[in-house]
């Protein structure tokens, strides 16, 4: 949104749920959630998952972090590329080889990417980001949107009705497709009007 350029700064942090949340990705749960995502983004493409299911998403977090070290724009584009590889192409984002393939396909600087990806620095960084999120800001799930002082922002979402682990129905969606941009604008406006919390010392 160009109207907020230079006024609002958005910083992404990793929060691997398999480490700081409820464990590794659950295939059955995610397959149910795809229907919610399909309703939210009618033009999105989803491919049925194959037997080659990722047992971890840490390589994907690491790869995205490595791309962000090249630039924020490259990082955000590559983060989206990873999501498309998983949801639209059915690729196993838990495999390091797949992440390297995606990096090559995206024409990233492979020397730069591989250095961080292979020396353990990326893993250390994302685990530290997740730890701070949980311990300092009490993050419990994703996505969590917050201001620099820890104030959490929320916008309306559609909640599913779940019975015996199955999604039976979904509430009315507050927005769909590009219509959700307005919700994002509302979040940015709240950020601009927000007065940071003051530290009270006794």
Question: What does each model-found stretch correspond to?
Answer:
Residues 1-90, 95-96, 167-173:
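Structural alpha/beta surface segment adjacent to cysteine/selenocysteine redox centers
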Residues 1-4, 85-202:
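C-terminal cap of thioredoxin/glutaredoxin-like
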């Amino acid at each position: 949104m160009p109207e907020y350029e230079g006024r609002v700064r958005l910083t992404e942090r990793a929060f691997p749920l398999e480490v700081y949340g409820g464990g590794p990705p659950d295939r059955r749960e995610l397959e149910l959630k795809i229907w919610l995502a399909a309703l939210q983004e009618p033009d999105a493409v989803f491919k049925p998952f194959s037997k080659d299911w990722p047992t971890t998403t840490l390589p994907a977090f690491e790869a995205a972090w490595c791309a962000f070290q090249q630039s924020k724009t490259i990082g955000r584009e590559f983060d989206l590329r990873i999501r498309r590889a998983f949801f639209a192409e059915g690729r196993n984002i838990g495999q390091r080889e797949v992440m390297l393939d995606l990096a090559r396909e995206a024409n990233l600087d492979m020397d730069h990417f591989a250095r961080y990806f292979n020396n353990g620095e990326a893993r250390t960084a994302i685990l530290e980001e997740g730890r701070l999120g949980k311990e300092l800001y009490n993050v419990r799930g994703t996505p969590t949107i917050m201001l620099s002082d820890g104030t959490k922002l929320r916008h309306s979402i559609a909640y599913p009705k779940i019975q015996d682990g199955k999604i039976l129905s979904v509430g009315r969606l507050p927005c769909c497709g590009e219509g959700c941009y307005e919700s994002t604008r509302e979040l940015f406006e709240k950020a601009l009007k927000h007065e940071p919390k003051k530290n009270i010392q006794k």
